[in-house]
Amino acid sequence: MVTPDRGQAHTLEAVAASILLLSSVAFALQVTAVTPLTGSTSNQRIEDHQSVVAEDVLASQAANGTLKAGLLYWNESARHWHGAPWDGYHDGAPENTSLGRTLNDALLDRGVAYNLNVYFWRNDQRIREQVVYLGEPSDHASVATWTVTLYDDDRLSDADGDPTGTTLADAGEAYFVPDADPNGPVRGVVVVEVVTWRM
């Protein structure tokens, strides 16, 4: 036989258990940082989007010839990029080139930082030429690359971005990419790399 006292004890026990359970859930929510990106694939989507944008910039610039023109924006007398210190640009790519304008419009103006590097081979070593350096990439950085073939008869650009009469063959050792085939028309094959991350 169940007495009224025993029924009240069960009710009290149930209320105490529910309070304990709700308190545990409330505590767990307070100690765990819950953000829109927690437990989702949003970070990966952002990285993928940044990578696709950088790849699209490189592909479109390669298709219309302005990717190579960006690589030819070189001051052979100073032996570095026009208007940049020896270690590249630190505030975005130069606006005098289509590549620079497009990278700045597509990435920098939208809160995405980027580094632009060119890789080439010299004496069996892979060398990196830093074109734009906007900082150390985050752990969630994305990378896009494009391969470009440079020829001896490609002409360097002046500070305004207009082609000069100086070819890569004329520039000789003053250009950063060594002549991989001195007896042939190819100067070298380089890999253009854009590393992107949110600022």
Residue positions per predicted region:
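Long, compositionally biased, intrinsically disordered regions
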Residues: 29-199
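Secretory targeting signatures
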Residues: 1-37, 53-54, 194
